[in-house]
Amino acid sequence: MKTLRIGSGAGYSGDRIEPAVELAEHGELDYLIFECLAERTIALAQQARLSDPDAGYDPLLSERMRRVLPFVGRTAGSRRLRVITNMGAANPLAAAREVRRIAAELGLSGVKVAALTGDDVLAALQTDASRLMDNDMTLASLGDRLISANAYLGAEGIVQALEADADVVITGRVADPSLFLAPQMFEFGWAADDWTLLGRGTLVGHLLECAGQISGGYFADPGFKDVPDLARLGFPLAEVNAAGQATITKVEGSGGRIDTATCTEQLIYEVHDPAAYLTPDVSADFSGVSFQREAENRVQVAGADGRARPETLKVSVGYLDGWIGEGQISYGGPGALARAQLAREVVLERLKLTGVIVEDLRAELIGVDALHGSKLGSRATAEPWEVRLRIAARCVERSEAVRVGNEVETLYTNGPYGGGGATKAVRQVVAVASLFVPRDAVNPVIHLEDSV
């Protein structure tokens, strides 16, 4: 039975490049998938594209392609490696042009590069009266604060690009597991309504999509869940057959671990209802999934199912939501905690005295209460040797946000004593919310060209 080998080259935009190169060179892959779009990433990319029509794709696209394109295509006695990625972000067409340019620069002729567009529905929804799920606002009410609206496409557009013999497929917003499902549908001829097979293929994508998470990265917890050679963490690959049966593994000799424990943790990652994991392709059912150790760093996956796909597509909406002003300062030595607490009280009082207008405010002592607040009960009796005060506020106006960091900085000379390492920053908030649109309102389009 034919076996397809699919590797995960990235779990987010800024992920390491070396493990992907290791997969391309030593993984004997058919497909290398780079999943690089978090929820806010595409909104930030859209801002970049508005400033420069040739920008708006992943900042590491060029470096990644320069490293892996030499392995793409057919080589005597080996599999044909193809690349699929959502690094096109807000500008898949410009990203595809960049890939073709790099291929030419490397002397690689005939590399077929496809761009998948159609996820950008901003123009169609700009005056829409639909309400966002997260805050009950309408798109129309956001006005010029609205910067992006991208529908989550499924696997079918990528399948069409593969049918057109593309070596590299560049997309914008596509559901994460759909990037991995597409090559399975194409290679095995799975029908777009074979829900069981699509559910199994979606499980493979879900397990691989975060790259190093399943091979021990996010899993590692020294003394409880030890992971060997974490600095050389290898990214995962799946061996899949036409029945959707899969084995998760990694390149032999790479760092990390793949076992039933790492697979189980990744299985429940970002899953609300295991029996109804909704994607544009299928409502996947993970409730019967099981893992079995096949050998060291090899785990068999079984038990996924699926039902009919949703009639709507999720749209991720990015909009401007004010400014965050932040200031930090450290205190060390005897009495560090008391001085940091006094500093916090001083800044909070100063913000009131000077009339700084804030929408939300956090004032925390890093190392003491920044993550859990008072929820874990009283703190340990031992005095910390160092504490860092962080005060951050969200403001409507940038000028108000600037004043937050300025007040923290004035602690240098206005007490308490011994503060150091003060920093301040202001950044614009890009918020993300969601809504649903009818499936037929979104029209994916494939653009295909060869490198020179």
What residues fall within each predicted segment?
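Catalytic or ion-translocation cores adjacent to nucleophile or general acid/base/metal-coordination motifs
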Residues: 60, 104-121, 181-222
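A conserved active-site cap/scaffold subdomain adjacent to cofactor or substrate pockets
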Residues: 198-305
